[in-house]
Amino acid sequence: MAIDKELQFTRNIGIMAHIDAGKTTTSERILFYTGLTHKIGEVHDGAATMDWMEQEQERGITITSAATTAFWNYNNQKYKINLIDTPGHVDFTVEVERSLRILDGAVAAFCAVGGVEPQSETVWRQAEKYNVPRIGYVNKMDRSGANFFEVVRQLREVLGANPCPIQIPIGAEETFKGVVDLVSMKALVWNDETMGAKYDVEDIPAELVGEAEEWRDKMLETLADCDDTLMEKYFDDPSTITEDEIIAALRKGTLAMQINPMLCGSSFKNKGVQTLLDAVCKFLPSPADTPTVEGTDPSDPNKVIERKTSPNEPLCALAFKIATDPYVGRLCFFRVYSGELPAGSYVYNARSEKKERISRLFQMHSNKQNPKEVIGCGDIGAGVGFKDIRTGDTLCDENHPIVLESMDFPDPVIGIAVEPKTQKDLDRLGVGLAKLAEEDPTFRVQTNEDSGQTVISGMGELHLDIIIDRLRREFKVECNQGRPQVSYKEAINDPVELREVYKKQTGGRGKFADIICRVEPADADFEGELQFVDEVKGGNIPKEFIPSIQKGFQRAMKNGVLAGYPLDQLKVTVIDGSFHPVDSDQLSFEICALQAFKNACEKAHPTLMEPIMKLEVVTPEESMGDVIGDLNKRRGQVEGMESSRTGARIVKAKVPLAEMFGYVTALRTITSGRATSTMTFSHYSEVPSTIAKQVLTEAQGRVDLIK
């Protein structure tokens, strides 16, 4: 029972937001107020505890997800908070994705001036995907142009959320000094002398009473929609609703993802962080609020297995991050969903089907490890000793295997060629790249078979900059880099039906496979690379050879017919075929499928696909014409323009990534440094034939196949 109680008072939460909304500063204040640090670290000084990589401290941004355990007393009860500080920059979106997969709740931070920005929209959608309940925190209330109510409106209109303010600010910009708590109807005013560690509870200032009552009524109305008991009281006599009932209704609505309680503050000025911690304890779920976790049987993917969130169940944990630590080596971060994980124990990896011994366990404080004997149910920890582990692997009891749903990561959109400067660097390069690729599923390393060049690919220029920086600092590798390359893909336009026969006679046993198949673009509602359909009747191709045909097509799709770019969104239907009782084997059918793919794609009007980026430019009115003119030259499509609250203009456009290299510098020149831009991946689209021919000529591809 004590363990269940401990679960009840545990919170696994993340802070997510657009870049520069103040996530790391908020995390630093949480560490300060919970007593984990005795001095506040500032991002702009390069001293933030959560930003522990040198590149993070230099650039003032968060790159990796730092995990920290803190404790907070609320209502005479000690709560354990596992806090993950995630990056806001779009190039590191994988860090957000894998953190949300294992969190129970999240704090969505918004800038009181910028409001809902492109990356805040991206992370909000990621949280929706993983059903993560959120509370909203409008930060930077002390800045010029801060407007809490405008941000609340944007949440409703841009994100389609149901924001429910439980506080309103007292003052704004330089006069911001506290908040009105709409639940207790008291004013909370922060004390500057104590670095914001203490605040005074006062009566609401007379000039705010009317506004506070109006917003309290809106809060109660929102809650009444989610809670039938409260609805009756709200319509009979709202004054009879108690504080405890409001808190219970807020928690219930948040857990059901019907509402998002909204708070405000200024983390940098030490105002609003304690009430945010209280709200985390009050409204966000504990591991016990998710009574079961679902997975599948490794031997039968259609069989669903449920595990209760209990220490008495067999072990079930998910590895969500791999990191290389200079002191302890390969570190695996995981979340325990059921059972317990003692140090020195063996665990079964459902993907590799191997047992691994975890030699040591840690609870993390940023990049420092605190040794632990056991990581309990519902907790987040890190371990060393794994030989073969990847992000998304399920760790379980060998006698009770289970596979949790893994994580999908986006394909890289940009690549650069790298070559070591000296022979000594060459030896270290392979080791460094392999370790970095283990840590980051959106980072890929390939060797060009023709030129022997090593090409590294990632989510953006900043992503690759930091990889090269880490090679230099952590692995002591100096390398030259080529110009950025776009990660093109290939696709086909037309359906093709063909017969492919593979026959080889070498004396003795030969090779034979015969396939009749239809190759065409995948169905519109299909998500993934290969949509494979088996329509073979009467055993003309034995069932044991069908997976080899599928494997052959999957292998072939990694190198398209135009210039060896990968191909996805393909549908292959195996209609018929034949086999030889002696000469046919799995390899014969795999090779036959490889040949069928090549011959079919050449006839199916192949086309080149390029990544299209969603671009948002904030520019002064007088530069708008130049900005739009420049986007038109870059094959951009302007989708809309609107005015920001600060009087600037916001231009929204879709632009091919190939045209966007060096855009930040060009934009600075056009607008005399007064504009900013954010870019996120949108989708892949067909390259116009004239440009496709240029690209294929440079890549020494099959220009003759482009119509």
From Swiss-Prot:
One of its GO terms (molecular function) is GTP binding. Residues 288-308 are annotated as: Disordered. GO terms for biological process: ribosome disassembly. InterPro entries: EFG_II (IPR041095), EFG_III (IPR009022), EFG_III/V (IPR035647), EFG_IV (IPR047872), EFG_V (IPR035649), EFG_V-like (IPR000640), EFTu-like_2 (IPR004161), G_TR_CS (IPR031157). The keyword Metal-binding does not apply. Signal peptide: none annotated. Keywords: Cytoplasm, Elongation factor, GTP-binding, Nucleotide-binding, Protein biosynthesis. PROSITE patterns: G_TR_1, G_TR_2. Belongs to the TRAFAC class translation factor GTPase superfamily. Classic translation factor GTPase family. EF-G/EF-2 subfamily. This is Elongation factor G. It comes from Porphyromonas gingivalis (strain ATCC 33277 / DSM 20709 / CIP 103683 / JCM 12257 / NCTC 11834 / 2561).
